[in-house]
């Protein structure tokens, strides 16, 4: 993305591709990103298996159950199960095709600084060559190595997800029954959970996620293969699928993998992907977060290079947007862990969300998001298949009930006459901390100044049109709906006044149902 914007980009890659990497299961949210990168046609032609959803043994029912992307994502109803050596090679070649100077086998050993600003890097190649490169921005995409996070002491380990994974690749695994044969399969068992991901190579990626502290001794005193086999045998469905399978590659181990950096952008540098944060892999979020942060960090650097006046604000916008996405996946994973009450083992007991106020808060933004999901959305599946903490489930249902009450009230107020006279006399009042702010928003490959609507549940702000900005700015707790419509209707072309009023009234209804407009006085 940076190269497309005209920047000269040097990519120093430690490995030589293709190389092994875990994280094969993509999400539909990554499809538009791959399209924007220009690599989607190559991904579609690579032969990867189409992933329609997930099948799980989790929660109160020992029978496998499935959810499907099409239930919540009509535009992109599927993703892919990718073989990472091939998939990552496609991404690397796509970078080369767009003008990036890619140097494989080059490891960055040090970031260079001058007066607190990152000014370049020192590297060493696998042939022993060393060198330095001066640059205007350093993008740290070093993954869990976390070069800048280590240098600046930015990484904060997540106390909730203290897990590790042992995984390998099996041939001749039995697939799930149709129509779920290409789904990722996740099975909880007393000491953790297992993933099984079918691949177009004929292999299946299988991994066990276990508690780091309690598993270290067993792993260190035995073989990884015996450890993985001992976990698989505890999961009846997975062990049945692998009954005639053979381990072809691995096992491998990934340790200490849940963390977030307190700062992801600064003077002359930005962190992207796993270098910035990583969350438990339950919802296959790793590749999506990496791709998303690649787009956002490139936009930040482009903006900072074009206009230094926006650099600091764009850095804050990048951090808000990226960490909001990270936070959503984190809270969703925490909710799923806490909902699995089928076992009293240490693994699951240690990952329960307690009801007391000191250890469990409603996390209003996440509750709002979950409450807005269709009944079969995968965020909602935990409420049906597991046993979510009572306070959380109660909060979600309370939000849903309040939204429905508001919708009915709004429709009733509009149905009095054809002109909607009952609603015209109402006096709207904004919820506390609702504001229109000028902030950087994501444009075409860069951050640009724009207008956002900020609320308690969306403090980072939602980009809004001039009409919404004008409407919300006029809501003062004294003007009626009719007066507000007259004012915004007068701001545009007089011939469009009627259409503007109708659009503004519809927008006001959405704001009321959502709670941004807290009250409608006089109704």
Outline where the language-model segments fall:
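Short beta-strand to alpha-helix junction loop
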Residues: 72-94, 216-223
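N-terminal FAD cofactor-binding segment of flavoenzymes
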Residues: 19-61
């Amino acid at each position: 993305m940076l190269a497309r914007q005209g920047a000269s980009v040097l990519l120093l890659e430690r490995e030589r591709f293709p190389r092994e990497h875990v994280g094969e299961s993509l999400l539909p949210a990554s499809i538009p990103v791959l399209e924007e990168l220009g690599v989607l046609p190559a991904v579609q032609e690579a032969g990867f298996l189409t992933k329609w959803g997930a099948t799980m043994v989790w929660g109160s029912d020992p029978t496998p159950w499935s959810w499907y992307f099409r239930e919540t994502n009509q535009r992109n109803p599927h993703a892919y199960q990718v073989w990472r050596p091939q998939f990552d090679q496609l991404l690397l070649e796509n970078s080369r095709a767009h003008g990036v100077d890619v140097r494989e086998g080059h490891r960055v050993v040090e970031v260079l600084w001058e007066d607190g600003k990152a000014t370049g890097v020192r590297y060493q190649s696998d042939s022993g060559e060393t060198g330095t490169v001066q640059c205007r921005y350093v993008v740290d995409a070093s993954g869990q190595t976390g070069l800048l996070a280590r240098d600046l002491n930015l990484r904060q380990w997540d106390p909730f997800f203290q897990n590790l994974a042992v995984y390998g690749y099996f041939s001749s695994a039995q697939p799930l029954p149709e129509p779920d044969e290409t789904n990722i399969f996740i099975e909880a068992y007393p000491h953790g959970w297992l993933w099984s991901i079918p691949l177009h190579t004929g292999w299946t990626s299988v991994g066990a996620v276990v508690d780091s502290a309690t598993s270290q001794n067993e792993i260190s005193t035995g073989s990884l293969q015996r450890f993985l086999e001992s976990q698989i045998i505890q999961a009846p469905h997975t062990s049945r699928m692998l009954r005639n399978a053979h381990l072809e590659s691995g096992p491998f181990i990934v340790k200490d993998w849940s963390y977030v950096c307190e700062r992801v952008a600064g003077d002359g540098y930005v962190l992207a992907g796993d270098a910035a944060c990583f969350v438990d892999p339950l919802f296959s979020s790793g590749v999506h977060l990496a791709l998303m942060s690649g787009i956002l960090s490139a936009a930040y650097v482009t903006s900072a290079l074009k206009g230094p006046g926006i650099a600091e604000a764009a850095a804050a916008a990048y951090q808000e947007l990226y960490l909001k996405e990270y936070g959503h996946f984190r809270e969703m994973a925490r909710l799923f862990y806490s909902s699995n009450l089928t076992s009293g083992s240490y693994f699951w007991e240690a990952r329960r969300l307690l009801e007391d106020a000191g250890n469990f808060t409603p996390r209003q933004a996440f509750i709002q998001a979950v409450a807005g999901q269709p009944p079969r959305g995968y965020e909602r599946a935990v409420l049906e298949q597991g046993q979510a903490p009572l306070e959380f489930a109660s909060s979600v249902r309370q939000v849903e009930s309040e939204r429905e009450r508001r919708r009915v009230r709004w429709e009733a107020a509009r149905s009095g006459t054809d002109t909607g006279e009952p609603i015209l006399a109402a006096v709207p009042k904004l919820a506390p901390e609702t504001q229109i702010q000028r902030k950087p928003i994501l444009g075409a490959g860069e951050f640009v100044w724009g207008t956002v609507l900020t609320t308690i549940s969306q403090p980072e702000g939602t980009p809004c049109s001039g009409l919404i900005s004008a409407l919300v700015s006029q809501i003062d707790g004294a003007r009626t709906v009719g007066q507000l419509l007259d004012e915004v209707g007068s701001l545009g072309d007089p011939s469009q006044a009627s259409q503007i009023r109708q659009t503004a009234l519809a927008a006001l209804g959405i704001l009321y149902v959502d709670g941004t407009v807290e009250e409608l006085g006089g109704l």
